[in-house]
UniProtKB/Swiss-Prot annotation:
Gene: rlmE
Superkingdom field: Archaea
Pfam families in the cross-refs: FtsJ, TRAM
Protein name: Ribosomal RNA large subunit methyltransferase E
Entries under SUPFAM superfamilies matching the protein: Nucleic acid-binding proteins, S-adenosyl-L-methionine-dependent methyltransferases
Organism: Halorubrum lacusprofundi (strain ATCC 49239 / DSM 5036 / JCM 8891 / ACAM 34)
Organism lineage: Archaea, Methanobacteriati, Methanobacteriota, Stenosarchaea group, Halobacteria
Length: 269
């Protein structure tokens, strides 16, 4: 039995609207995308197979919203909201923002593919274009630390797109789920931990230490973002170098303190 028949038949038996549901299941198994209570946005969601999987994984306490130019039939067994519209239009994005709330989405997923022409270079270019559109929407909708999954066809423009995504997230991997057809050039970029920090590693900034952390480090804030500063006391204003910037907090070391050599030299005089 071919891979296509296997997953097609399985989807019919288990009540999924599309065989692609198993791709998302396999990606989730590998990358741990979903948690109970998550808010998920599915871009290009018709016919709804990925919506079904997402709704199962986030449970009744979660929120799942799908958007597509095509109408998506109601999902009787799942509490899913669907929006018919173009995700690149501000009107549709407004509806999406209203649906997910001010906190934003925990996960944005996209299984979109262009209408195939049979001309590989053209199909690849269109695929990357769709993926970039999904990336733009994901950056707008995701909460800090959120995750992004997008399908794209392999080709000459993939590496540049992959690096653009990598620059905005803590971690990126490329996944080829077993449910993909052997003849397909599709891969999925799985990006974890959207980094919206107002600082980056290597930045030198002046901060005021406002609190002390559990491990003894000072804590300063930049636009509400927490930076742990070693060897600094509460109330000190110090110049620091950021050594690591994670989505919700970062680490920095002081660069305004004297060196041991200079201290010894002063004592010698």
């Amino acid at each position: 039995m071919s891979g296509k028949d296997e997953y097609y038949n399985k989807s019919k038996q288990q009540g999924y609207r599309a065989r692609s549901a198993y791709k998302l299941k396999q990606i989730d198994e590998e990358a741990n995308l979903f948690e109970r209570g998550d808010t998920v946005v599915d871009l290009g969601a018709a016919p709804g197979g990925w919506l079904q999987v997402a709704a199962e994984e986030v449970g009744e306490s979660g929120t799942v919203v799908g958007v597509d130019l095509q109408r998506i039939d109601d999902l009787d067994d799942h509490d899913v909201e669907t929006i018919r519209g173009d995700m690149t239009e501000e009107r549709t994005r407004h509806y999406l923002r209203e649906a997910i709330g001010e906190r934003g989405a925990d996960v944005v997923i996209s299984d979109m593919a262009p209408n195939m022409t049979g001309e590989y270079a053209l199909d690849h270019a269109r695929s990357v274009h769709l993926a970039r559109q999904a990336f733009d929407v994901a950056e707008e909708l995701l909460a800090p630390g959120g995750d992004f999954v997008v399908k794209v066809f392999q080709g000459e423009d993939l590496d540049a797109f992959r690096e653009d995504v990598r620059a905005e997230f803590e971690y990126l991997r490329t996944v080829s789920p077993p449910a993909s057809r052997d003849s397909s050039s599709e891969v999925y970029l799985v990006a974890k931990g959207l980094n919206t920090a107002p600082v980056a590693a290597g930045d030198r900034i002046e901060v005021t230490v406002e609190e002390r952390g559990d491990e003894g480090d000072g804590i300063a804030y930049v636009e509400g973002y927490s930076i742990f500063v070693s060897d600094a006391d509460v109330g000190e204003t110090v110049t620091v170098e950021v050594v690591d910037a994670k989505p919700r907090f970062g680490f920095a070391t002081r660069v305004d303190v004297g060196t041991p050599d200079s201290d010894e030299s002063d004592e010698g005089e």
